[in-house]
Amino acid sequence: MIGILGGGQLGRMLALAGYPLGLSFRFLDPSPEACAGQVGELVVGEFLDEGALLRFAEGLALVTYEFENVPVEAARRLEGRLPLYPPAKALEGAQDRLREKTFFQGLGVPTPPFHPVDGPEDLEEGLKRVGLPALLKTRRGGYAGKRQ
């Protein structure tokens, strides 16, 4: 059985893609209404609740997460017990868009032009470097156009 941290629509889609391969899934999510619970076993609990993590992890072959906004500490706690893919360090990097883009750039992976904006004074310089039209995103949190 594969464990997925998060029981939203992305977790649900992961499970639907895995079923034709004969895989089964368990989800950990704080909401009893998590939609992934329709397609797999749902453990309701907070990501950092030790009891919920233990119930979730029991009997799993491996763990992954549905998106990058899962608490890194939850991933670290599970990583010590069973295989976690991608590893917690990768999750931590993916949670900061600036760190992620800088990392990819260092590997030679093409990225759109970007400039860090830590305050209003950086915005003008960023627009000069990036040009218009431009997109301003938060460094952390948000997904799929929400708080980005």
Question: Where is each model-derived feature located?
Answer:
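ATP-binding N-terminal substructure of ATP-dependent carboxylate-amine bond-forming enzymes
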Residues: 1-102, 121
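Short glycine/serine/threonine/alanine-rich loop segments
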Residues: 23, 109, 132
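PLP-dependent amino-acid enzyme catalytic core
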Residues: 63, 110-113
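Structural signal for short hydrophobic segments within the conserved structured cores
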Residues: 41-43, 92, 112-116, 148
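Glycine-rich phosphate-binding loop of ATP-grasp-fold ATP-dependent ligases
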Residues: 112-114, 134-148
